[in-house]
Amino acid sequence: MSVTPIVEVKHLEKEFGFWRKNRILKDVNFAIMPGEFHAFIGQNGAGKTTTIKCLISSYQRFKDEINIDGISNKNAKSKGVISYIPEYAVFPKHLNTHEYLYTLGKLSGCSLQTIKEKVDYWLARFQIEHLRFKKPNDFSSGQKKKVLLIQALFNDPKLLIMDEPTANLDPKTRNEFMDVCYELNVRNKMAVFVSSHILAELENYCDSLTVIHEGEILFNGKTKNIAKDNFGYRLKVNNSDSLRKWLKAQKIAYKYFPATDDFQVDLKQKQSNKFAVELYQQPDFEVFIFARQGNSLQNIYNNLIEQYEYDQVQRAVAIREQDEAV
């Protein structure tokens, strides 16, 4: 029996502008399964926030389909499944923390008893009970994010969406915040969707990810799969053409990244020692770098971006050659 994705995005496109259209999202497709801790990663301007605003229906005009737990996000019922924490916290200036949380709890349809239990528990858990009757608009970034998380948990969401949740947080607060989200993911089977460009902080939490770059999806799936596919050795020499010929003669698959003029080769453990000895014995080039690549999200991300840029260059060359041939 197939499992319905908690998030399913099909052929999403989003443009801005009236006379001159600026296409931000280009045929975006990805899915998140129930209970996953999912990282949505990309550099600033890649389209992360635009995608999230389409998911939560902040943007109404976009092309094609978004489903939340099998329900179109244009259907009001889909809103009961999700909670959202924006990158920047904005609070009414006239409400204190107690008033703000009780108001949002009522709007979420919770009973006063449920609101009291949740507010009391989470204020104590986050050690901010002393801020109950102070205005969150005046809090530090970390304290504001804690209040937003308490608010987001009123409706017991199946999916928690967070846009750059740890931006401007100190390391201690950042770890505390992410640890709580991970606990909710494991204990409540709540799917967590985190947009970030700080990859190191997601390393210990996420089990799946989507990589977006210049409005296009480069990867969507389990981290263990992409880690396996991108594991290898980084190789840089003083004569790339000679190295390329030697690798072909050895029948060793490689990827070449012209932006940095280096190579990635995938080797089995038993191959690596023999390969290294023969590599350093070659007279036609000098080895500058021969280093094993780790399976960190940063290395995975770098490899995907380098491959994307290489493909773009190759595509541009092919188009130019076709034009010249006409």
From Swiss-Prot:
Gene3D superfamilies: P-loop containing nucleotide triphosphate hydrolases. The keyword ATP-binding applies. CDD domains: ABC_DR_subfamily_A. One of its GO terms (molecular function) is ATP binding. PROSITE patterns: ABC_TRANSPORTER_1, ABC_TRANSPORTER_2. SMART domains: AAA. It comes from the Bacteria. Pfam families: ABC_tran. SUPFAM superfamilies: P-loop containing nucleoside triphosphate hydrolases. ATP binds at residues 42-49. Transmembrane segments: none annotated. Residues 7-239 form the ABC transporter domain. Keywords: ATP-binding, Nucleotide-binding, Transport. Belongs to the ABC transporter superfamily. PANTHER family: ABC TRANSPORTER ATP-BINDING PROTEIN ALBC-RELATED. This is Putative ABC transporter ATP-binding protein MPN_334. It comes from Mycoplasma pneumoniae (strain ATCC 29342 / M129 / Subtype 1) (Mycoplasmoides pneumoniae). The lineage of its organism: Bacteria, Bacillati, Mycoplasmatota, Mycoplasmoidales, Mycoplasmoidaceae.
